[in-house]
């Protein structure tokens, strides 16, 4: 997913770890894991859900 800049990403994650967690808490978990690479990205779209 890029508007020509090459650094816009869409990440879709399905995990049982997300069960019972709000979307904001799911995204916080992913952001914590990706914190070292996020500054180099122009844009990031997260889609997270549990495997229910």
UniProtKB/Swiss-Prot annotation:
Q: What SUPFAM superfamilies does the annotation carry? A: BolA-like
Entries under Pfam families matching the protein: BolA
Using the record for this protein, list the coiled-coil segments as residue ranges, or answer none.
none
* PANTHER family listed in its UniProt record: BOLA-LIKE PROTEIN 3
What family, per the record? Belongs to the BolA/IbaG family.
> Any idea what this protein is called?
BolA-like protein DDB_G0274439
Source organism per entry reads: Dictyostelium discoideum
């Amino acid at each position: 997913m890029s508007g020509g800049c090459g650094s816009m990403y869409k990440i879709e994650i399905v995990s049982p770890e997300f069960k019972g967690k709000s979307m904001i808490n799911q995204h916080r978990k992913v952001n914590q894991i990706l914190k070292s690479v996020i500054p180099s990205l122009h844009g990031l779209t997260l889609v997270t859900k549990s495997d229910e």
